[in-house]
């Protein structure tokens, strides 16, 4: 874990964190409702795994992610996920063919909310702290996802606790989740409504030894 934190922090510094602010050990924070664009990059090979719009209900712990039609360098259908963390399930939705899969979510951790066990590492300025409106103050957090043996490195804004980016790593993958065009509201609450063709779909069991979580879903696309 310590080696991972040091390596991840080094990457962050290279991305433009120019001024180190004194850390005061902030309390764990909670993200607001959000609508925005999420881009997922595989750091090995530099492949964009997915990019699309999302809505996040931070109260009821729901995410709807719909992959952008501009991401067309793939042969399969565009990804459309409805993740219900309180229920511990997600739906893989195919609007074109009106089909749906329902599977278990084995972890509540994801890139749009600071996980409960996250440990604060440092507070940083992105940009310049001496030029007005040319800096963003962020908190850096690290932690692990025991269910998938993954480790993460997550940055949130100081104040509203908006997640900016998340590095997620296991023995086999390293992904970067970038959050942009964020609006602190759910613009269309109906996106959390289950399509009629998904109602009554039976839960599919994951293959033995496979653990499904937010991060692994994007590694499979």
Swiss-Prot record:
Residues 1-21 form the signal peptide. GO terms for biological process: cell-matrix adhesion. Belongs to the ependymin family. Binds calcium through the terminal sialic acids. GO terms for molecular function: calcium ion binding. GO terms for cellular component: extracellular region; lysosome. Keywords: Calcium, Glycoprotein, Secreted, Signal. It is found in: Secreted. Its main location: secreted. May play a role in neural plasticity. May be involved during axon regeneration. This is Ependymin-1. EPDs are synthesized in the meninx and secreted in the cerebrospinal fluid. Glycans are attached at residues 33, 73, 97.
């Amino acid at each position: 874990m310590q080696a991972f934190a040091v390596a991840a922090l080094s990457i962050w510094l290279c991305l433009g964190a120019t001024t180190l602010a004194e850390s005061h050990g902030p309390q764990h924070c909670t993200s607001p409702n959000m609508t925005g664009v999420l881009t997922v990059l595989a750091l090995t090979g530099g492949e964009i795994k997915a990019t699309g719009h999302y809505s996040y209900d931070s109260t009821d712990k729901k995410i709807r992610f719909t992959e952008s039609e501009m991401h067309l360098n793939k042969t399969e259908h565009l990804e459309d996920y409805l993740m219900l963390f309180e229920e511990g399930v997600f739906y893989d939705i195919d609007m074109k063919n009106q089909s749906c899969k329902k599977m278990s979510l084995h972890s509540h951790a994801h890139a749009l909310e600071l996980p409960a066990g996250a440990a604060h590492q440092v507070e940083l300025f992105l940009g310049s702290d001496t030029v007005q409106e040319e800096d963003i103050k962020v908190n850096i957090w690290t932690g692990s996802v025991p269910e998938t043996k993954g480790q993460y490195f997550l940055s949130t804004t100081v104040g509203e606790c908006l997640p900016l980016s998340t590095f997620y790593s296991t023995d086999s993958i390293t992904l970067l989740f970038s959050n942009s065009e964020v609006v602190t509201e759910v613009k269309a609450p109906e996106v959390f409504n289950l399509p009629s063709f998904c109602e009554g779909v039976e839960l599919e069991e994951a293959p033995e030894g496979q653990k499904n979580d937010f991060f692994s879903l994007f590694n499979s696309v």
